[in-house]
């Protein structure tokens, strides 16, 4: 009898540990539903209907594997990806990596910050500059949660992720997509023209986020006193599966809603978020438009927090330089205010930032695969042969797409 009770107690204890370890992937997943995703998915859906849904599906599957490898690196070694690059690569290469990672982090932050500002503009009817100031203030408040430990921040960011997911369940309900066409487009790879390739690269850059690859390895690198490495890795697999499935659903819903409402409603030229909001109201109803504005704001606010955290990890990891998070937030806000002040097309900036991000994916992936495939570093958590093959295949696909994009830009 005592043995049975001990067994039940141990099982409950392990289950508590498993759930206590959930959370880091939800912070990482926020990077996959930022305003850049809104802009790219809406333009892709409005222009090509359901045709590019397969890109979202495969990009999300790739992202799941990549985030799992990043988290696994932190668990197995107690160091994040940037720290491993600093320790094992030549100094000149480390500085090159740091500079490109900072540029990518700033491009990401630009997209996220402007997206949240657009959300406030839509909801409150205020100028974009005031929306940007409000975004900065709320981001500061969310970042102060870090002084109370990781869990409060994980709880808030995870809550915003669920909010955006629920918002898009509502959007799907109102838009009434053609589910047979939707399902077929998720399976059939089609790239009708060069613009589709450009938008696909944007979708890839918006779905697989280089800065989140660096961040996730830092979120799991702390030693746990209550769980073994195998237990932590087991919990991480569940964490990544749940969080990335939610993020994938949101991205699919964004594109499917845009396809159903705009493309098949005859509004194939929708190219910015303000236009999308204004068109949603007469085509569906005012509630759908408000839900869109709320989800954009929530995604923008949460992803700016994640972007700031990632920027700090990149700076500390590569060059051992630390500045207070709030000061970093002020510095990274400046490009957004410049874009807004000069009246540059904010949605175009969002999409271009996502294409820029796609160029940083391979640079993060190559060292990640090298380190997680090293048995001396990873021990029993080293990548299997299949994982190595799939990882390098993903890297090759990303590089080929980037080369195609570069040729297209030059020509």
Curated annotation (Swiss-Prot):
This is Divalent metal cation transporter MntH. It holds the Pfam family Nramp. H(+)-stimulated, divalent metal cation uptake system. NCBIfam families: nramp, Nramp_1, PRK00701.1. Keywords: Cell inner membrane, Cell membrane, Ion transport, Membrane, Symport, Transmembrane, Transmembrane helix, Transport. The gene is mntH. The chain crosses the membrane at residues 19-39, 46-66, 98-118, 122-142, 153-173, 196-216, 242-262, 289-309, 323-343, 349-369, 390-410. GO terms for biological process: iron ion transmembrane transport.
């Amino acid at each position: 009898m005592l043995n049975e009770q001990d067994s039940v107690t141990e099982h409950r204890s392990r289950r508590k540990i498993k759930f206590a370890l959930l959370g880091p992937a939800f912070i990482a997943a926020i990077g996959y539903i930022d305003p850049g995703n809104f802009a790219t998915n809406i333009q892709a859906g409005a222009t090509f209907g359901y045709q590019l849904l397969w890109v979202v599906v495969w990009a999300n599957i790739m992202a799941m594997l990549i985030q799992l490898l990043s988290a696994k690196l932190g668990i197995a070694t107690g160091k994040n990806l940037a720290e491993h690059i600093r320790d094992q690569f030549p100094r000149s290469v480390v500085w090159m990596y740091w500079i490109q990672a900072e540029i990518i982090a700033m491009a990401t932050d630009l997209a996220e910050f402007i997206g949240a500002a657009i959300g406030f503009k839509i909801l409150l009817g205020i100028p974009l500059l005031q929306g940007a100031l409000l975004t900065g203030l709320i981001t500061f408040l969310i970042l102060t949660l870090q002084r109370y430990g990781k869990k409060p921040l994980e709880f808030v960011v995870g809550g915003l992720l669920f909010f955006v997911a629920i918002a898009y369940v509502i959007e799907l309900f109102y838009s009434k997509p053609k589910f047979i066409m939707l399902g077929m487009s998720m399976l059939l790879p089609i790239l009708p023209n060069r613009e589709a390739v450009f938008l696909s690269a944007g979708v890839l850059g918006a779905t697989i986020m280089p800065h989140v690859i660096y961040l996730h390895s830092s979120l799991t690198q702390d030693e746990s006193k209550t769980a073994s490495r195998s237990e932590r890795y087991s919990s991480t697999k569940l964490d990544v599966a749940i969080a990335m499935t939610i993020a994938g659903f949101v991205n699919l819903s964004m594109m499917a809603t845009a396809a159903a409402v705009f493309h098949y409603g005859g509004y194939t030229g929708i190219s910015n978020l303000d236009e999308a909001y204004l068109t949603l109201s007469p085509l569906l109803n005012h509630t759908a438009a408000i839900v869109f504005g709320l989800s954009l704001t929530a995604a923008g606010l949460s992803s700016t927090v994640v972007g700031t955290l990632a920027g700090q990890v990149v700076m500390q990891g590569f060059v051992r330089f630390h500045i207070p998070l709030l000061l970093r937030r002020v510095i990274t806000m400046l490009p957004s205010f410049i874009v807004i002040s000069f009246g540059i097309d904010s949605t175009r900036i969002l999409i271009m930032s996502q294409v820029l991000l796609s160029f940083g994916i391979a640079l993060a992936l190559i060292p990640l695969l090298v380190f997680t495939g090293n048995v001396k570093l990873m021990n029993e958590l080293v990548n299997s042969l299949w994982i190595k093959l799939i990882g390098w295949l993903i890297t090759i696909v990303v590089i080929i797409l980037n080369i195609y994009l570069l040729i297209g830009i030059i020509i």
